[in-house]
């Protein structure tokens, strides 16, 4: 199924899984979307941080929290909260998602903006390469617009 690129508020998605980029240290990030996610799902972030501090979460992987609607997928694409998003980590996470989505019982995924606009130009071809051939329906948010539902998520 093709990838759909949308703009809007990922928190309003109808997809059962919301994926977003995060760091391997489990530290809070300061963007508007990250702050909204942290305020809405504090238990998910606390558990994720605990797993990071214990060394169970590595860059290039993802970790799922299924105790919310939508479920949350922390895509570990940065080593630290102030570090750059690494192409190799994005590639690894996308490859795993495209290959193993059935193991995680995923029927569709909405992916929140993974990084800033400048980094996204380099990452979009990588994301597209790994997800376009997958039968998993994917909606990728290119721009975060608070309070606005995307048309096809």
Placement of each model-derived feature along the sequence:
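Macrodomain-like recognition of ADP-ribose-binding/processing modules
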Residues: 1-153
């Amino acid at each position: 199924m093709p990838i759909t690129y949308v703009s809007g508020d990922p928190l309003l998605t109808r997809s059962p899984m919301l994926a977003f980029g995060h760091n391997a240290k489990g530290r809070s990030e300061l963007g508007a979307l990250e702050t909204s996610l942290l305020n809405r799902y504090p238990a998910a972030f606390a558990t994720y941080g605990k797993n990071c501090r214990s060394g169970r979460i590595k860059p290039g992987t993802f970790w799922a929290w299924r105790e919310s609607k939508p479920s949350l997928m922390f895509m570990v694409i940065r080593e630290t909260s102030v570090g750059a998003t690494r192409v190799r980590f994005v590639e690894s996470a996308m490859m795993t998602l495209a290959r193993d989505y059935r193991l995680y019982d995923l029927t569709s995924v909405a992916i929140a903006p993974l990084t800033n606009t400048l980094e996204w130009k380099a990452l979009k071809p990588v994301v597209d390469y790994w997800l376009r051939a997958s039968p998993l329906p994917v909606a990728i948010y290119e721009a975060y617009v608070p309070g606005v539902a995307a048309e096809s998520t």
